[in-house]
Amino acid sequence: MKFVIYYFYIIIFFFKSYLFAENKHPIILIHGFLGWGREEMGNYFYWGGSQDFQQNLREDGFEVYTVSVGPISSNYDRAIETFYQIKGGQLDYGTNYSENLNIIQKPINKDYKGFFPEWSAQNPIHIIGHSMGGQTARMLEKLLKLKIKDETSILLSNEYSGWIKSISTISTPHNGSTLVPIML
């Protein structure tokens, strides 16, 4: 039995680089319904409360960013806001969408520097979404793969395949929520 245990440790020692791969891609945190960004609640963080989850991950060597999207906006709006906060550029909800809902297509003061302007298929991201943030992440993945004809938005007029390495969700209502009937 001791031989088996020692053999196991030797295998782990020699192959640990294969067994425990390092993450080289940024992690994006997306808050849920009624959530907030890092700068919006003082020293109380959506991701960690009085503890700073983003900072803890950074101290462990990860590149991590938290987006701040509309707390009660649609997943479509939140996904587009997420895209521009990560990539950078003037927020653009799209021509058809803006005209159909009579909203401002390119809101003033929504021109983002971008957390990770290098974002591409060669530089993908990991997304962690909590609650509605998971739905927002899935909508973003859908919009990245969608190319809309006659659209001028950078996001909606191009197809971006392979830009998301993984999506992890925490308490996301993927099949809907029982909250809606209660609220109506």
Residue spans of the language-model regions?
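Short, flexible coil/linker segments at or flanking structured domains
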Residues: 7, 18, 70, 115, ...
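Classical Sec-dependent N-terminal signal peptides that target proteins to the secretory pathway
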Residues: 2-21
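Serine-dependent carboxylesterase/thioesterase catalytic core
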Residues: 31, 83-86, 90-184
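Intrinsically disordered, low-complexity boundary segments flanking structured domains
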Residues: 14-15, 51-54, 154-156
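Active-site catalytic motif of lipid deacylating hydrolases and related acyltransferases
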Residues: 22-125
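Hydrophobic transmembrane signal anchors and adjacent membrane-proximal interface regions, especially
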Residues: 3, 45-47, 162, 181
